[in-house]
Every structure is written in structure tokens, then in C-alpha cells.
Amino acid sequence: VTEGLGPRLVEGGATFGVWAPKVTSLAVRAGGRVVELERHERGVWRGAVEGLAAGDDYLLVLDGQRERPDPRSRFQPHGVHGPSRLVDLGPPPAPFATPALRDLIFYELHCGTFTPEGTFDAAAGRLGHLVDLGVTAVEVMPVAAFPGSRGWGYDGVALYAVHAAYGGPDGFRRFVDACHGAGLAVFLDVVYNHLGPDGNYLGEFGPYFTDRATTPWGDAVNLDGPGSDFVRGLILDNAEQWVTGYGVDGLRLDAVHELHDRSSVHILEELAERVHAARPGALVVAESDLHQPLLVTAYGLDAMWDDDLHHALHVAVTGETSGYYDGFQDLGALAKALETGWVFIGQYYPFLDRRHGRDPAGLGGERFVVCSQNHDQVGNRAFGERLATLAGPDLDAVASVLVACSPFLPLLFQGQEWGETRPFLFFTDHGPGLASAVRQGRRAEFAAFDWADEVPDPNDPATFERSKLDWDRAGGPVLELWQALLRLRREVPALGNCRRDLTTARADPERRLVTLERSDPSGSRAVVVANLGQRSQHIPFDTGKLRLRVATRPISPSGDLSGASAAVWTT
């Protein structure tokens, strides 16, 4: 039903298709002219404007009065409240062979803070570092246009428009091409569960939102009510745009548990089908906190973010047990997370005060993306502390070893590879009214911790600047550790096979030891021992013919593993 919607450049001008059942008239204002569009079935308006070309700006005029950007605008160079710009993306991207799912090693970056310049072009200049690190995929936090110049991107309002401050659509296309030229796949974080409050005009066009459900961030998207065919189409066409128009190799779907859909065919199933058909080899990864195997087994998604390993690691190295960390206190939770993926597979979870999760039996380890840091787990803290700050560099290294040697797909968060200690804070760029509300809300969120007066102001430009990586630190022993770990993952079949069924993990709470064993049908074997305590402990197995490959701290001649350290042996 959405065929022909959006702006399209044609010979001699441009055509426009807009779903706007709420308006009685709709026109395009461009080049000093106002051209009325014609209403068709189901509230779709269509028309053409002669003489327009790529680079021309335009606005939609609703009911002869309100001037608004196009819901399918590909560029908002003057901000989310200003006119839209016609864009020619050029020829289709050159083919790129996306790595096999099990070979993915993700590097999550935020374009605005990854480099001092905060642009796609500047980020492209750092790709050599990522290649040397050993990752295989760059996961870019949301780039859909959002208010102002600074933000995480999760309050985007123009889903098709690439954020101007980063370099707009041309900059993003160059970045994707540069990644492919360096042999790196590109995954894009997209947000379909809500739109931000600032610059969100979709509700003036049609029933894009529903009052049947809400999300923690605002109105839920109308995926199953009257008019939802067009709302779903906005999402599905957008997903296809990224993988075909820009050459993105995969999508990371934000918080899919907040996609409220009672349709016969769930939006996730339809989206996976669309992406896989539009670009064979393209992948879809979902963030969900519901522990539902059906995301893969029924809906056809390729993988899921797995927070349980993060939570178990975080508790083990920091001792924090409040909030959603309650339930991960036992060191056995870490062993279970390393073996199973999810700790909660149907048992009681104190944080929720109910049973939680389902056994992911039959799913390979390549269906889970794991980390010890990501934008959420760092940035949603009041002060955005990195794990190296909270736990110290030694235990941070232990967590890194367990993530890299797990049977799952590892993800690093920007700067983690050199032990970055600069925070990743929550930052925004709103007008005075909304900025005040966000500031007060942020302080109220952490008032129980007596931090209310100290929480950084999200709208202060200094908060954003403090979150930028310190590239002067991009080196040293932490980087060498990660390079060694990722090299082992590539070279040792037992570490790279993602075989949960050939993985065992044991915890010794008394000695604060966790032992992880991996094997492969080829005969390859790997053993990882992590000492999460402060005292040296004797290595709990006969190393035999295994060769020591990595040790985060020296192992004594008598075979004792130092406190707060980990080591890896392989055949």
C-alpha cells in the first residue's frame, strides 16, 4: 500500500506521495511555488512538481496553513523542524559479502563522540584502528535525524533522514563504502518502537500512534489499529532503504519488546522477511529483554542482544546487586550465562518478582550478542562510568576475556579496547522547555541515590564533550589483550565455532573461580580460567598438553593464577 510514497526524483522534477488521512488539503511548497497534491484512496496524496532537482528544499503545507517536513524526508539540513531536501543517493552500493553470522565481532560506536570531529568522514579515518583490533562489524548507533546536533539518536523523528551534524546521507554513504573497503560490515541501530517528542509531526498526518499501549519513552506506534498498514509500511520501507540504498549489512532493532503488535503477522516477522528478500545476506538483530527464542525461531530474526552475561559479569566484578542486577549474585549465574546465554529461563527473577525467560534449547551461540559494556549499560548510569572505572583495569580485563572466549557473538563499546575511562554520559540538544524537563527527569531518576544535584546536565554541551573518546590513549596493554583474544577467536576452532553444545562452564564460589571449556569436532580445545577474587588460586585443572595463549597477569611458577586475572589455554 505504500508504493510510491515519499519524494522521488524523476526526469524534469520530482514526485511526492504522502499518507495524510487527517488533512483536507496537502501541498508542496518549493522554489517559490505551492503545488497542490491530489487525494487518492485511503488518505494518500500524490502529485508532481516540475523543475526540482537534488539539493532543492521543500515543505509540505497541511490544510493551507501548517508547514511541515516530509515524513519520508531523506535529509533535514536545517534541523527536524525545517524544510526537507531532495536527495539523489546515486547508483546502488557495490556488493559486499557480509561475514557469516558466527564470524561477527561487533564494535558499537556513536558517530558524534567516536572522534573529536563527530562526523562520518572522521570516523572513516579511524577504520584502520578497527581492522587492526580484529573486529568484523561496525554497529552504528542511530543516525535518523533528531533535534539539535547532540544526542544518542534514540529520540529520532525523521526516520529516513540521516542526521545532518554527522554528514547527512552523502556522508553516511561514504562511511559505509569506506567500511566495506576496509573489509568491515556495517550494522545500523534503528528505533521503531517510538519517536522522540521534539519535531515529531507524524500525528498531524495520520494515526501513527496508539493510546492502546505506551512505552517508557512516549506513545506507542500504531502497528495493529486502523491505518496501521501505512504505519507498518513506513517502518518496512525504512528498513529496506538502509540495506539497499546505503548498503548497510544488518540492522539492530532497538527494544523490540516495546513494539506492541497483535496482528496476525507480527511486524518483526514481516520486517525480517523484507530485509532478507531485499538484500540476501543482510541480517537483523533485535534487542529484547523478554528472553523469547521465538524472535529467531518464529519471526526469523538472526540474533538477539543478550544482557544476562553482562549482568552476571557486572555483579561478579563490581559487587553491585541493585535493580536488575538482583538475581545475579551467585557466581553460578555467570557460569550459566556462559553456557546457556540466558540465566533466567523460566525461574523466579527477583527484579521482576515473577518467573522470567524461556530455555533457548536448540539455538546456537551465534544467535546471542554479548558484551561487558555497551551504550545502555554505561550511559544509563548517572555518571556514565566505564567498567574499567567501576571495577578497575584488572577485573575489566577478566570480563573482556570471558566475553571474547564465550560461545556467543562479542560486542565491544567504543574505547573499551584500550580501557577508556572517559564516561559515556546521557546528552541531548533540546530547546529550553524540553531541556528543563529532561534535566529534572534525569535528576529525579537518581534522587534515591542522593545524586540529584550532581547528575550532569544532559543539555550542557560540556556533557557531550566529556563523552568523546580520548584517542591519545588508543594503545597499550588493554588493546594488545583484545587483539590477542580476537586473534585466538579467529584461529582456534574451539573458540570461534559458537557451539553452545560443546561448551561447559563451572563456578567455584568459595575460591571465586570460573572455568570455561570449549571444544570442536576437529579436536580443538580451549580452557579459560577466571579468578574473580583478590587472592591467587591454584589452576583447577591439569594443563597437560594445552598451551598458554593469554594471561592478563603473570602465572606463578607453581601454577597459581593471580587474583583478578584470567588465562586462556588452547591445543
Where are these regions (language model features)?
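Core domains of carbohydrate- and sulfate-ester-processing enzymes
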Residues: 62-95, 182, 201-216, 324-353, ...
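Conserved alpha/beta catalytic core and glycan-binding cleft of carbohydrate-active enzymes
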Residues: 80, 268, 272-448
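Glycan-recognition and catalytic regions of carbohydrate-active enzymes
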Residues: 340-357, 412-413, 418-427, 452-526
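Substrate-binding/active-site clefts of carbohydrate-active enzymes
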Residues: 98-101, 106, 110-250, 255-283, ...
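C-terminal beta-strand-rich structural cap/linker in extracellular carbohydrate-active enzymes
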Residues: 20, 54-56, 557-571
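Short, well-ordered beta-strand segments enriched in hydrophobic/aromatic residues
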Residues: 16-18, 525-531
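The feature marks proteins involved in alpha-glucan
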Residues: 1-11, 15, 36-108, 113-118, ...
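Short proline/glycine-enriched turn/loop motifs at strand-loop junctions of beta-rich domains
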Residues: 19-25, 533-535, 543-544
